[in-house]
Structure formats: C-alpha cells, structure tokens
C-alpha cells in the first residue's frame, strides 16, 4: 500500500497583468489543496513586508479636519489620496520626503521630491487639485512594515515624541492587494482523487506575485519548523537530551529577523548582541546604557519581543548552545 504523500510541484505561472499572476500547483493529496491554499492566502494577505506613508505634516494644517485655501480636496481626502501612493525603499527602513507645488494644476505622486533609493510605483496617482494661488507644502514619512497598523496604535506608542501638526496615518504595508484560490480535481496515473491548487495573486508592484508566494511559503516553513524540532518523550537513556540543553530555535535566530529599525539594529550589534537569545537576557537598564539607543528604540524592541512571547531580563540556563555560530 502506498504510504508516502505526494509532493506537489508548480505546473505553471501565468502572468495575467503586470502585477497579477495565476499559479497552478499539483498534485496534492485529497484535502491538502484547501489546507495549504487557505494557509498561503492568509499569510499573503497579512504577513508580507511593504512600505507605506505613516506620518505627514502639511504647512498650514494642525489636524485632519482642516481645509486649505486653493486646494480642492479637504485634508481628510488629501490623506486618503496619500495613502494610495505605492512606495518602494531600496536600502533603508524609513525616509522623510517633501512635496511642494503651486497651482493651478494637478498634484500627482511624481511631484514628490525623492532620494535616489526611493521609488514610486504609481507616479500618476492623483494627490490633489490646486486652483490659481493654491499651494501645497508637506513632509511625508514613509516606513517599512508588515500588515496593517492603525494610526491610533502608533500614536499611543509614540506619544512622548509626537510633534504638534504631524498627522499619524493608518498604515497598510501589505504589497499584496488580492488573493484567491480554487481547488480542482487532479489525476496521477490511476489516481483520480487528488487536488490541484490554483492561486490568483495581485500585488501593488513592490514585489511580483511569484516572489510573494515564495515569501509566504518561507514564512510558513519558518513557523512550522519549531514543531518539527519537538523531541519525542519516548526517547530515553543517553539519546534523550536534558531539558536544560534544549534551546528554543527562535532564540538562535539573528536579531535581524526581528526587523528592527536600522538604528536599533546597529546599536545592538555594537554591543555584540547578534542573536535573539543574547537580547532577551539584557535588562532595560543595560540597553538604555547603550550609546545612541534611547527610550523610543527600547520600546520598539520590547514591542517586537512581546509579539513573539518574549521579554527582556529573561534567564537562559544553557546559553549559548554549543552549535551556535560565532
């Protein structure tokens, strides 16, 4: 009797548009099409890294319910239009860019003054309409992130450093616009009870649909490898590792995997903190003594660790493990 599960392979990747593709994978054992299709779809929609405007300061505007003379849109619609711009940062995690234009005319994304390593994927996106005498002068902060972060959450976290007149935006970082999947019947030789998984993926241009599904699969593998590392309780004698010698694989991952800001990451490396296991053993007071690492960076580190069920000041009995690369 056949006991090995069939391993699927990608049959075809069909480009429907510049940013949309259909990926067909088969064969799957019966039921695995829905199992993996749903998991991939959820990861694609929630866990892809992208870029979004997170904060804006507009000359003459104190809050989002204001209006500007000579600008057709009110500030609320202006902010909605700003959030529709698709940014791509090449070598940094955040940037502050400027937009200055006088009317009459249409203000589009290509009017933004960009550094050499920042790209706009939809330069014709309309931001505002200016009449004669109208003027638009703003600073936009763009950051790297994952998923969706409401503005009020970011505002509370940054309350101590908030500047009057700076408007915090809801940030949708995900570069994946739409994902759908369908499961069809497939056949291999005499077996007709197999699944074919058809996924349709649309992105905003920051990454291709093919790259998106590769990243989603890597995230799933990275999450599931922890379960594969579980030791059987039936192993006994010298073959059974002691509880104290077993280290959570999460702690052996580099701090770069936490996706901290460049400033925070560089401060940690300057203190020879290369792994998550190194980091969680430090206390808040120890980190605050690190040059250039302030309260804001400390809060960022604490939030990132908390999202993974970790915290500062933890004790590890068997750290560093013998197999940890120096």
Curated annotation (Swiss-Prot):
Read off the SUPFAM superfamilies from this record: C-terminal domain of RNA polymerase alpha subunit, Insert subdomain of RNA polymerase alpha subunit, RBP11-like subunits of RNA polymerase
A single MF term (Gene Ontology): protein dimerization activity
Where is the stretch described as Alpha C-terminal domain (alpha-CTD)? Answer: 247-326
Q: Answer yes or no on keyword Transferase.
A: yes
Q: Which domain of life is it from?
A: Bacteria
Q: Which CDD domains does this entry report, sorted A to Z? A: RNAP_alpha_NTD
Gene3D superfamilies in the cross-refs: 5' to 3' exonuclease, C-terminal subdomain (1.10.150.20), DNA-directed RNA polymerase, insert domain (2.170.120.12), RNA polymerase, RBP11-like subunit (3.30.1360.10)
Transmembrane region(s): none
The GO annotation for biological process reads:
DNA-templated transcription
- Coiled-coil residues are none
Its recorded reaction(s) are: RNA(n) + a ribonucleoside 5'-triphosphate = RNA(n+1) + diphosphate
EC numbers: 2.7.7.6
A cellular component term from Gene Ontology for this protein is: DNA-directed RNA polymerase complex
Ranges where the record places region Alpha N-terminal domain (alpha-NTD): 1-231
Alphabetically ordered keywords of this record: DNA-directed RNA polymerase, Nucleotidyltransferase, Transcription, Transferase
Q: Which family does it belong to?
A: Belongs to the RNA polymerase alpha chain family.
Question: What biological function has been recorded for the protein in this entry?
Answer: DNA-dependent RNA polymerase catalyzes the transcription of DNA into RNA using the four ribonucleoside triphosphates as substrates.
Q: What is known of its domains?
A: The N-terminal domain is essential for RNAP assembly and basal transcription, whereas the C-terminal domain is involved in interaction with transcriptional regulators and with upstream promoter elements.
Q: How does it assemble?
A: Homodimer. The RNAP catalytic core consists of 2 alpha, 1 beta, 1 beta' and 1 omega subunit. When a sigma factor is associated with the core the holoenzyme is formed, which can initiate transcription.
The name under which this protein is listed is DNA-directed RNA polymerase subunit alpha
- Supply the source organism for this entry: Polynucleobacter necessarius subsp. necessarius (strain STIR1)
Organism lineage? Bacteria, Pseudomonadati, Pseudomonadota, Betaproteobacteria, Burkholderiales
